[in-house]
From Swiss-Prot:
Species this chain originates from: Viridothelium virens
Predominant location category: membrane
Keywords, ordered alphabetically: Glycoprotein, Membrane, Transferase, Transmembrane, Transmembrane helix
Protein name, as recorded: Prenyltransferase vviA
Residues of this chain annotated as glycosylated in UniProt: N172, N208
The keyword DNA repair appears for this protein: no
Taxonomic lineage of the native organism: Eukaryota, Fungi, Dikarya, Ascomycota, Pezizomycotina
Pathway the protein contributes to: Secondary metabolite biosynthesis; terpenoid biosynthesis
UniProt GO cellular component terms: membrane
Membrane disposition: Multi-pass membrane protein
Amino acid sequence: MSQPEFTRSIVGASFLLPVINGAMHIPPAVSATRVTLEDNQPRDAPILVLLFALSVLIDVMDKAADLPRQTRKTWLMTIVVFASPFVVLAVYGTMHCGLLALLRLLGVPLLAVVHAMPLIPVYSWKTGSISTVKLKYFLGPFKSLFGATCIGLMDVTAVVLYLRGTMLHPENASSAGHFRVLMYTITYDFLWESICDVRDIQEDEQNNITTLATAFGVRPTLIFLGGSTMMGDLSITLLGGGSAVLSVVRSTVFWGAFAALALHKPRSAVYPWGLATLFGLLPVWLASLGART
């Protein structure tokens, strides 16, 4: 890889994608505010700003840790300068929403630490002993479901808990609406995470990482994702009194678009994948518009 290509790769991965990933969290959070706040109460922008800023900062730190060691020092100051405005946004959001809202949002990413720790006891019939394994190994190919649940708890539940504290009549908040938005978020983030696993199948096979794609193959995985997304969206929509036709169309269109991208565009295609990431959880917002609260 030439130096200009390497530079573009770092800029895309360390700066562009974190912002896009941060924006990806907004549709579920906006949907959560829609089903939670009273009709005569204005939408609460600071919690959305705080969620966006924290998501960007977490992703920037994650991408910085993945940089080659020989280039990390060179790019460190640039990364710090880039992250500074988002630190300011996070401080602004915390000042308006309170420390408890910040801790609720940060508590979910900490589950990723638990995810990588050997905490699950497993008994071996062969040796007659009990050992502990990491949760991500215990979940096997369905570990992306754990990640999707974490995203749902961060983007929806943590936001809803804060919003209920700002309401004049929190007892009027729709628990059913909150649950539906949470389930939509888990459904579509599971689709997105699994599509990314299909894209990265060769890299995961080389690193002995178990995913749906490495365990069952690309075609069966895509078929399973299409069916599970359609059934998940349809079930949630019917429970909320929404349109079954719109549900099927929505799930089919987004599954088809993401599947085509995974099959035809490599991970190095930053802009197509960045655009797809931006729309990854848009179905959550679209679904919440058609559901009754």
